[in-house]
Amino acid sequence: MNKRSKKKDLKEKAKKETVEWVKALIYAVVAVVIIRLFVFQTMMVPTESMFPTIVPKDRLFVETITYQAREPEHGEIVVFWTPFVDKEAQKMLRPFDHFMNAFSPKEFDGHVMYVKRLVGQPGDEIELVRTEGNNGYSVLVNGETPDKLAGIEYSKAGIFTDPQFYRKMAYPDEYPGLSAQQEKFFEYYNSALDYRSAYKRVYDSMAVSEYAWYDEERDHVKLKVPDNCYFFMGDNSNHSFDSRYFGFVPEKNIVGGPLLIFWPFNHFGTVNSDLPADTEEP
């Protein structure tokens, strides 16, 4: 075999290997897309709202099939699309996140995924009560604390301080008596989130008293979860932006349950929905 023929054979071999690698890459991408569309979602957790079960920068595999067959239960950790466009959280997403989110429903463009613990199902009445010996508050759902929520202390904030909280957050200019701290809070979240649009979709068709009211006898605010909606809170209550602030989450926004932490490797493992021994800040 002469040099020219040998060189030609090497080129042909390299060409075939390149084609095989390209085909393998295409098959891998197709497989990822199919799995993403029908079985799994992925997300990166940016905050410490679910510490210590899930910590900032954990990346999760989210299983999306279970909640197509049944309703999520009290105390389960659930991943859902925010009811609002979240401009600030969008800035924290990496190219991989944008690629995976590209296969999500168009109605959630600009939204991000949150992971929290489910506290209220449709029709549930929810209240926070001070219990003896605790610094925080325990949650009552229809008069009782669900077993999977019994070990968590919550801070009384947001809607639990004022039945008008959601409306004030959407229309702060209608409430001239707000404190400087409230004005700053509402101003920030109305610029970071498209909250007013989300409020209109969920609440404009109902009176505030249908979902939040002050119970004179109990001396605190009580909530009732509207039909086709859920109420979520983070375990690390003082560091969680959750339904206390932004309101109820429509059923259609639920993505699934976190199954596995796949990154970083030193956190690799399944996500345990059981209550952690400690929910304090690290």
How would you describe each model-predicted region?
Residues 2-19, 55-282:
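Soluble "head" domains of membrane/secretory-pathway proteins
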Residues 29-32, 48-49, 65-68:
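Intrinsically disordered, low-complexity boundary segments flanking structured domains
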Residues 41-58:
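Alpha-helical transmembrane signal-anchor/signal-peptide segments
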